Curated annotation (Swiss-Prot):
Gene3D superfamilies: 3.30.70.330. This is Deleted in azoospermia-like-A. Residues 155-180 form the DAZ domain. GO terms for molecular function: mRNA 3'-UTR binding; RNA binding; translation activator activity. It is found in: Cytoplasm. Belongs to the RRM DAZ family. Its main location: cytoplasm. Germ-line specific. Oocyte mRNA expression is first restricted to the granulo-fibrillar material (GFM) of the mitochondrial cloud and then to the oocyte germ plasm at the vegetal cortex. Remains an mRNA component of the germ plasm until the neurula stage. In 2-8 cell embryos, expressed in the germ plasm matrix between germinal granules and mitochondria. Expressed in primordial germ cells (PGCs) later in embryogenesis. In addition to the ovaries of adult females, expressed in the testis of adult and juvenile males in spermatogonia and spermatocytes. The gene is dazl-a. Keywords: Cytoplasm, Developmental protein, Differentiation, Oogenesis, RNA-binding, Spermatogenesis, Translation regulation.
Length: 286
């Protein structure tokens, strides 16, 4: 009898024994020389179980299944290094610490793989955007040229999920989109803005000597701006009530500077000119 026939007969016998004990074996491959032990108390440890099952053969490994917190789930597996009769161990009624153990063949579950289904990738709809304005430029945005992209296969298949089409933006792009700029405006609607230049003009005036001497020429710089249209300089008017031009006259008698307002200065200037005119008329009449 070949090894395959022996394993098949052993699996059939183990399944019959499991059905007789009232539980159904899961689908999978029966592990040789390994026994499933259920009904393990929390107080039991692996050393005690190893010492107890040495009567059936040389115990290779004892594995108690625990949860994430390390608490025993109440079952485990015992592997023997020698050839043992697993059916004999399963049929025997074993009680440990006054508690009956549930024995059965150890079965390795078969990992079922679902054939991966390719995910359908749809290319995005070409996007055209045109914005026109009479007084502005026209921008036309074309869709970017996309290179062929390899279809991605879903790594984690879900058997119960229906086929789905995922629309996403492709990653592999050869070159970005192009923009065409075409200026559209009439010639008479163009307007140009230039910075306003600043010019400084020197304003010449004469300060009168209080002793009746010759007038003293002086220069006062005045800033003027030129309009953007290129016309004449814009005059800057100063209200006499809000701002007065102070003229500093040197007094040789008292050796200090006296300050007079614009109104007093103009009044004294008119009186001085009238006096000079009268003196000139008198000299001519003589």
């Amino acid at each position: 009898m070949s090894g395959k026939e022996e394993s098949s007969n052993y699996a059939a016998t183990a399944e019959e024994e499991a059905v007789n004990q009232g539980f159904v074996l899961p689908e999978g491959e029966i592990m040789p020389n390994t026994v499933f032990v259920g009904g393990i108390d929390i107080t039991m440890d692996e050393i005690e179980i190893r010492d107890f099952f040495t009567r059936f053969g040389n115990v290779k490994e004892v594995k108690i299944i625990t949860d994430r917190t390390g608490v025993s789930k109440g079952y485990g597996f015992i592997s023997f290094s020698d050839e043992v009769d697993v059916q004999k161990i399963v049929k025997s009624q074993i009680s440990f610490h006054g508690k009956k153990l549930k024995l059965g063949p150890a079965i390795r579950k078969i990992c079922t793989y679902v054939q991966p289904r390719p995910v359908v990738l749809s290319h995005p709809t070409p996007f055209h955007h045109a914005w026109n304005n009479q007084n502005a430029d026209s921008y036309i945005q074309h869709s970017p040229i996309v290179s062929p992209i390899t279809q991605y296969v879903q790594a984690c298949p879900y058997p119960s999920s229906p086929p789905m089409a995922i629309q996403q933006i492709p990653v592999g792009c050869q070159q970005p989109g192009y923009f065409q700029v075409s200026p559209q405006w009439p010639a008479d609607q163009r307007s140009y803005m230039f910075p306003t230049p600043a010019f400084t003009f020197n304003y010449h005036c004469c300060d009168m000597d209080p002793n009746g001497g010759e007038p003293i020429p002086r220069e006062y710089p005045i800033d003027q701006t030129v309009s953007a249209s290129g016309a004449n300089p814009q005059k800057r008017y100063v209200e006499m009530s809000t701002q007065t031009i102070v003229s500093c006259l040197f007094d040789p008698a008292n050796k200090f500077h006296s300050f007079v307002s614009q109104e007093d200065y103009l009044k004294d200037n008119r009186v001085h000119h009238l006096r000079r005119r009268e003196s000139v008329i008198k000299r001519v009449s003589k």
